[in-house]
């Protein structure tokens, strides 16, 4: 993912299986079920795939050769259909609740004229399934990165762009992401109670507190606690609330593990806190300088966030730190910070410490069984997706294995998202390729009966199966 800093830019539902042949559709009811995924059944890849060695429409070497991949949207096609699309497709979210839950994917454009698009997974027409909802440059939106579905049924994104004197670093809510038909009727609202930072990861805990980060060398981790955590709309949720910066072992330190406390950087209503909050010229709060005043613990380019819920109900917040090649875990029940993955973690392919083979961890994703995936911010030929094993769920991984490797020249993989209604489907974007043709790729584990048909030589382009909500 690109790292946008003001003035300077630093680099930083349908289950479809890819084969050839006819479209088979099987309608069925959605139902809740315990999840079991086939994505953890693989032999770790020993090395990267060579840059440019695979077609852009199927750019990944996958660690299990039975898994399939198919392009479900690409930018060149969108432009040919007259859709405004500035490219650099970034993080992915789906409509996880409400009517037609799981039907749509949403993603922002991480460009100087950013926007938001939606992919309809139930639309078989490749030319019409993807629609731009927020036109590039709306409200001066730049560097769209964050992507999250809210508990009340809307879509959040935010700007990965912040610096002293900036007007960016804002959080936005698309309040009608499912019902909007395009740019003409979408409702895109800035939520100004959130302090300005260089946004990437967003996550809600079970109490509906919202976590976010400042992607910066020396960036902090934050928690927003709404005065109305059970709000049924964003107007009420973001009306008033307090933001805190994480302190580990007392704060005022770097890359720390140990005891967690939360230091306020705003008052209870989201306004300035005397002696702590730093105001921008427009009256908004500078989250970065305010966290420094509150002695928030600094991490080195914290990027994506994920929350995992354990069987006992405890929740662990994970954060990737790109500069230090680490992933941290923060147990929100015990208030303990740990190092989840670093250079000393064992590589499943060699049995030795992974060292600098794992480089620039950026995105995180969690599958239906709670397994963690780490996506590198690297160019094609070096960009890998890693599977992390934490068998005892203590927040410290025992090993990592290379799960996929991407070949597309000039690109990086981003936004890995596991379908909440089918544990054997995932989506990932191929961002800023040299060709300029960003893509969304669907990766799938064939169901046993489907795989048998493949072995028998029967062809499928798509297979719509019963959608099962994952618990």
PLM-predicted stretches and their roles:
Residues 447-466:
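A short, hydrophobic C-terminal helix/tail in secreted or cell-surface proteins
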Residues 6-7, 21, 43-46, 241, ...:
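Generic alpha-helical secondary structure signal
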Residues 7-9, 284, 462-465:
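General helical secondary-structure elements
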Residues 468-471:
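Short, charged juxtamembrane terminal tails flanking transmembrane helices
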Residues 2-33, 458-459:
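Gram-negative bacterial Sec-dependent N-terminal signal peptides
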Residues 34-444:
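Sequence/structural signature of beta-propeller domains
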